């Protein structure tokens, strides 16, 4: 309670998403439970570390760098759920450059043990994260999104098909969307 009365300390919970992304059926539930608990205490949430772990079986776990969209779309789904359901106000990735595993946005290939020579390759994951960063700016506000069926009836949770289309919209501080 000492920190909660200090006006210089933000009322934030910083979290890591390890082991909360599978099974898919729990991805949303865990984030909604977190949001409900933090709302009771008027505490904001920042997702401060995420990477691919061994339990992320849908994409083969964390081993082996992935040049395809599979990991990028998997992580985009996590970002969507963190922002939409946990109401994360900030979202951060674990590692920028790495070896032969999925948590590096850029793959490094060294020819010596000193990392003084070699080459790098980007990943689709880097571009997926870049699109969130490019278009959803600090201070952006998430807008309400609804989905309707062909008769005009509201589809409950129609903004999120966990294995398909997920929709969220944002308005930036400068008025851009």
Question: What kind of feature is each model-predicted range?
Answer:
Residues 2-4:
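Short, small-residue-biased leader/transition segments that mark boundaries at the very start
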Residues 6-9, 38-40, 84-86, 120, ...:
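Extracellular/periplasmic catalytic domains that process cell-envelope and extracellular macromolecules
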Residues 7-58:
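Glycoside hydrolase catalytic-domain groove-lining segments
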Residues 15, 93, 131, 169-171:
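Hydrophobic side chains in beta-strands
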Residues 32-35, 77-81, 165-168:
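Generic recognition of flexible, low-complexity loop/linker segments
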Residues 44-157:
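Aromatic/acidic polysaccharide-binding cleft in carbohydrate-active enzymes
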Residues 150-177:
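Carbohydrate-binding surface patches
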